[in-house]
Swiss-Prot record:
Transmembrane segments: none
Assembly behavior: Monomer.
Keywords: Amino-acid biosynthesis, Aromatic amino acid biosynthesis, Cytoplasm, Transferase
Protein name: 3-phosphoshikimate 1-carboxyvinyltransferase
Positions with a binding annotation for phosphoenolpyruvate: 21, 95, 123, 169, 346, 387
Principal place of residence: cytoplasm
Length: 438
């Protein structure tokens, strides 16, 4: 399926974006190995998260999926209750699922194969294979990419590990393995990454120690059931935040969005560029802060993106670069080489698409330089990347003509009702097949 857009006359209204993808992954995994029954409200029913649910079900977890209400009811099997799956576990397109499951499965008393789609089979896994091996895990792969064959070892040993680069997925993978290891596992990271795993461990009553740069867990503990309500995903909200910011006449409110400080880079950077964003009704529930976000149209200016904001914005850069494309002046992004090993090479994909829409964009080895200008209509390729597809749908709100975005089926991995919500607030996005459109 493709997307086709026509320019918007302005966004308005109030919407609630679906539940946070990162928290959904971690929550269902942890409650599956907890003791007792947990209800998970606001679970993201995207393909990536449902791949995690399926994998856990294949290992004996009892998970009732109430899809139309975004609810899971999970009867935990306890720390030692998982069973060997009958076949390889398919993680689909999800790098988070395969890395978290690798940590969980490294300490089980059975062997497992983890695989995924063609995109996932190009994603780098050496970053988890090396430290898990130090803990006593044995993992076979060809070229350090999936499929991964994990030979479970119930006698893992805790380690003190310095992450070479900050990564919430790697940190979480090792913490999960540490739950099954003898002794203490401590992870030190060079900069703060998203801390949903740590917050969830606390919510499910697992003892951990944390200081500014390190997090430690000791093996042998138990997770206890505890109902949880997942906030809206700020990575999904970002598409509407940028769309309202760049489209004249816009004013929208996004309800109950997760505003974890480790995820606020996109708001920080947009405010540096001159955006009119107001965060109100701040509350904290289930260890996670949430708030309403009101956004009004504003004129933006280009900036040099500070290095300390890169990790906090890593998933939102595709749509942030759309904001840069219409800002006055130049925007420079560096220290973001991680964007090249996402679902696609996001630096190359964004530069290619922006150039096709008339924007001067230059690729750097670790980033991009964008000279703000006027978005023209045209046709771009999403390269089967959900965030690229939605970013260019946002570009279509302000482009001078229709924008066609190729290969958008993958949006279902993270935001199944994107088109519905986009049109609800006035973005004019249509899913089309063949050569049809507006």
């Amino acid at each position: 399926m493709d997307y086709q857009t026509i320019p918007s006359q302005g966004l308005s209204g109030e919407i609630c974006v679906p539940g946070d993808k990162s928290i959904s992954h971690r929550a269902v995994l942890l409650v599956a190995i907890a003791e007792g029954q947990t209800q998970v409200d606001g679970f993201l029913m995207g393909a990536d998260n449902l791949a995690m649910v399926s994998a856990l079900q294949q290992m004996g977890a009892s998970i009732q999926v109430i899809e139309d209400e975004n609810i899971l009811v999970v009867e935990g099997v306890g720390m030692t209750g998982l069973q060997a799956p009958p076949e390889a576990l398919d993680c689909g397109n999800s790098g988070t699922a395969i890395r978290l499951l690798s940590g969980l499965l490294a300490g089980q008393p059975f062997n497992t194969v983890l695989t995924g789609d063609s995109s996932l089979q190009r994603r780098p896994m050496k970053r988890i294979i090396d430290p898990l091996t130090l803990m006593g895990a044995k993992i076979d792969s060809t070229g350090n990419v999936p499929p991964l064959k994990i030979y479970g070892n119930p006698r893992l040993t805790g380690i003190h590990y310095q992450l070479p680069m900050a990564s919430a997925q790697v940190k979480s993978c090792l913490l999960l393995a540490g739950l099954y290891a003898r002794g203490k596992t401590c992870i030190t990271e060079p900069a703060p990454s998203r801390d949903h795993t740590e917050r969830l461990l606390k919510h499910f009553h697992y003892t951990l120690q944390k200081d500014k740069q390190s997090i430690c867990v000791s093996g042998g503990g138990k997770l206890k059931a505890n109902d949880i309500s997942i906030p809206g995903d700020i990575s999904s909200a970002a598409f509407f935040i940028v769309a309202a910011t760049i489209t004249p006449g816009s004013a929208i409110r996004l309800c109950r969005v997760g505003v974890n400080p480790t995820r606020l880079g996109v708001i920080n950077l947009l405010k540096m560029m001159g955006a009119d964003i107001e965060v109100t009704h701040y509350t904290e529930k289930n260890e996670e802060p949430t708030a309403d976000i009101t956004v009004r149209h504003a004129r933006l200016k280009g900036i040099d993106i500070p290095p300390d904001q890169v990790l906090l914005t890593i998933d939102e850069f595709p749509v942030l670069l759309i904001a840069a494309a219409v800002a006055q002046g130049k925007t420079v992004l560096r220290d973001a080489a991680e964007l090249r090993v996402k679902e696609t090479d996001r630096i190359a994909a964004m530069v290619d698409g922006l150039q096709k829409l008339g924007i001067a964009a230059e690729s750097l080895p670790d980033g991009v330089i964008i000279q703000g200008g006027t978005l023209e209509g045209g046709e771009v390729n999403s390269y089967d990347d959900h965030r690229i597809a939605m970013a260019f749908a946002v570009a279509g709100t302000l482009a001078k003509g229709p924008v066609r975005i190729r290969n958008c089926d993958n949006v279902k991995t993270s935001f199944p009702n994107f088109v519905e919500l986009a049109n609800e607030v006035g973005m004019n996005v249509k899913g089309v097949r063949g050569r049809g459109g507006f």
